[in-house]
């Protein structure tokens, strides 16, 4: 059983990407935990584009100061970390809304217990496995919509963002790979 199955065994949407890394699983997973997508110009640009409607509405309503900072990994809750194996983040919300409709989860227990009609749950995992002297790094995103209404609302959003999401995932994996391999080079040089 994969760690993500503990948190989101049922889902209607899924996206999986992977890459090989010349570093030990523990180093790769640590690089994944340390990575911040907000440091990627493409990610920031796509999030800015995604948030244009929210920010425009706030400006029109004279509430520019009430708009949250740009979306990022800080919105996610770390659900579990198994060193050298996997880590899972969770996010809950109405992602199709201009403001993402996020519901703050304080803990893994809150995430597991949450079940509200009209509100989706997302799980994002990074898994590492050693394969022939390399580490296979895989990221999987799953989304569960608890009812027909949320499923119908989320579906067009998923198909709209999925191509960009795939590019972002590939860039994240590449950055984690580079950071992991650089850590090995730096460690070997000292």
Which role fits each region the language model picked out?
Residues 1-79:
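Hydrophobic ligand-binding cavity/cleft-lining segments
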Residues 33, 91-93, 139-143:
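Short, hydrophobic/aromatic-enriched beta-strand segments in well-ordered soluble domains
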Residues 2-11, 45-55, 95-97, 111-116, ...:
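Structured surface interface patches that mediate subunit assembly and partner/cofactor docking
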Residues 35, 39-42, 86-93, 104-106, ...:
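Glycine-rich, low-complexity intrinsically disordered segments
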Residues 72-133:
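Hydrophobic-ligand binding "helix-grip"
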Residues 108-164:
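Beta-strand/loop substructures that line and gate deep hydrophobic ligand-binding cavities in soluble
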Residues 153-188:
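A conserved amphipathic terminal alpha-helix motif
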Residues 12-20, 86, 121-123, 134-138:
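Intrinsic-disorder/low-complexity, polar/charged segments enriched in Ser/Thr/Lys/Arg/Asp/Glu/Gln
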């Amino acid at each position: 059983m994969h760690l993500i199955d503990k948190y989101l065994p049922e889902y209607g949407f899924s996206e999986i990407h992977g890459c090989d890394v010349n570093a030990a699983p523990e180093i790769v997973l640590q690089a994944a935990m340390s990575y911040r997508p907000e440091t990627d110009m493409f990610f920031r640009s796509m999030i800015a584009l995604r948030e244009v409607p929210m920010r425009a509405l706030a400006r029109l309503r004279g509430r520019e100061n009430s708009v949250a900072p740009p979306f990022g990994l800080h919105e996610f809750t770390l659900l579990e970390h198994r060193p050298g194996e996997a880590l899972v983040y969770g996010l809950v919300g109405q992602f199709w809304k201009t403001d993402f409709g996020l519901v703050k989860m304080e803990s893994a227990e809150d995430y597991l217990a949450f079940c509200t009609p009209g509100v989706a749950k997302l799980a994002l995992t990074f898994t590492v496995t050693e394969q022939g002297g390399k580490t296979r790094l895989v990221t999987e995103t799953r989304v569960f919509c608890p009812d027909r209404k949320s499923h119908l609302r989320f579906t067009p959003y998923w198909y709209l963002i999925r191509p960009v999401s795939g590019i972002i995932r590939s860039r994240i994996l590449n950055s984690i790979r580079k950071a992991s391999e650089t850590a090995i080079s730096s460690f070997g040089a000292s």
